[in-house]
Amino acid sequence: MRLLIAGGGTGGHLFPGIAVAEEFLSRKKGNEVLFVGTWRGIEARVLPKLGYRLECITAAGIRGKGSVARAKGLAKFLYGYAQSRKILKEFKPDLVLGVGGYASAPALLAARGMHIPRFIHEQNAIPGFTNKMLATVAERVFISLEESRKFFPEERTLLTGNPLRRQILEQVALAPQEERTDDAFHLLVFGGSAGAHRINLIMGEVLPHLEDVKERLRITHQTGENDLEDVTSAYEEQGVAADVVAFIDSMADAYRWADLVVCRAGATTIAEITACGKPCIFIPYPHAVDDHQRRNAEALLKRGAGFVIIEQELSGEVLAKTIRDLMADPARLKSVGEAAQGLARLDAAQVIVDEMMTSKRKEK
């Protein structure tokens, strides 16, 4: 069988698609996967390195833009639609999955016109414009969080969770945390592959408020390239043991090491946090479309599976107090981690592939 996965732009859209691709290829020798994305998206850098085929089309957003920009966006969409039809005719997929992002719309709509079974996956609590529109033409809508169900047709919507790459599933979700005999407290801080400038800055303000517990603290902080030197200097000046890096090669190892995580609330991050059963202080990115990161984090908060500090209320003192309180309450840390793990859907990729294949068999 052949599967075409359309979308990307960000890791939050792309990585669930990669997880589904891994599962689909593992089912039967001879299965094939083709990704469709754009040259501007993260897929253009990531997929070739992983050995996946990628076709790039022209696509752009039109939401919330002026009339001239909308006209240009529409022209790009029509061109991308024509490109998608050509790709579909050449690849001849049995199934098409949209994972969100600009490229998913022309590809899914072209698949509809060619009567190819099509599906979408929504990663966030608040769906993006593209997926809300594509839900009208998709045979199945797969969702990561129960909160997004109300935006889609009930009879065609299935809660699957957010698919995770096998690296995470194998190295973290299935591996026990190392036993430690010392009193060290491991804090993992990160903000995605590019870092998060606000989180990087705030940690410098946090440290003076943790002076009396800094001997216990062991921090791994992923900053991205831009803030690496400044953050490194901040930890050195405060005398706090910290491993400050631009990138973390193995998030699986980092999660396993951590007692507490401080990070943004992107969909993939939340899926990884829950799979690992890690207590986390989420600081949602305030400029995400439809404020979806805050909604993602609140979905865990209301289930006792995480902590949330919105940026408008963020200060060094507030974050330090939250960290200090949790350092002093291992039972609470444990219960929140267990609640997070209770929300994990480790079989998300399997369920999605099963559903797509079942739909294809019914078609026959």
UniProtKB/Swiss-Prot annotation:
UniProt keyword terms in alphabetical order: Cell cycle, Cell division, Cell inner membrane, Cell membrane, Cell shape, Cell wall biogenesis/degradation, Glycosyltransferase, Membrane, Peptidoglycan synthesis, Transferase
Family: Belongs to the glycosyltransferase 28 family. MurG subfamily.
PANTHER family assigned to the protein according to its UniProt record, in alphabetical order: GLYCOSYLTRANSFERASE, UDP-N-ACETYLGLUCOSAMINE--N-ACETYLMURAMYL-(PENTAPEPTIDE) PYROPHOSPHORYL-UNDECAPRENOL N-ACETYLGLUCOSAMINE TRANSFERASE 1
Any one GO molecular-function label of the UniProt entry: undecaprenyldiphospho-muramoylpentapeptide beta-N-acetylglucosaminyltransferase activity
Pathway membership, UniProt: Cell wall biogenesis; peptidoglycan biosynthesis
Membrane topology: Peripheral membrane protein
Chief place where the protein resides: membrane
Catalyzed reactions per annotation: di-trans,octa-cis-undecaprenyl diphospho-N-acetyl-alpha-D-muramoyl-L-alanyl-D-glutamyl-meso-2,6-diaminopimeloyl-D-alanyl-D-alanine + UDP-N-acetyl-alpha-D-glucosamine = di-trans,octa-cis-undecaprenyl diphospho-[N-acetyl-alpha-D-glucosaminyl-(1->4)]-N-acetyl-alpha-D-muramoyl-L-alanyl-D-glutamyl-meso-2,6-diaminopimeloyl-D-alanyl-D-alanine + UDP + H(+)
Subcellular location: Cell inner membrane
Keyword Cell membrane: yes
Binding site for UDP-N-acetyl-alpha-D-glucosamine: 10-12, 124, 165, 193, 248, 293
InterPro entries per the UniProt record, alphabetical: GlcNAc_MurG, Glyco_trans_28_C, GlycoTrans_28_N
Protein name: UDP-N-acetylglucosamine--N-acetylmuramyl-(pentapeptide) pyrophosphoryl-undecaprenol N-acetylglucosamine transferase
Enzyme class at the top of the EC tree: transferase
GO annotation terms (biological process): carbohydrate metabolic process; cell division; cell wall organization; lipid glycosylation; peptidoglycan biosynthetic process; regulation of cell shape
E.C. designation(s): 2.4.1.227
Cellular component terms (Gene Ontology): plasma membrane
Function: Cell wall formation. Catalyzes the transfer of a GlcNAc subunit on undecaprenyl-pyrophosphoryl-MurNAc-pentapeptide (lipid intermediate I) to form undecaprenyl-pyrophosphoryl-MurNAc-(pentapeptide)GlcNAc (lipid intermediate II).
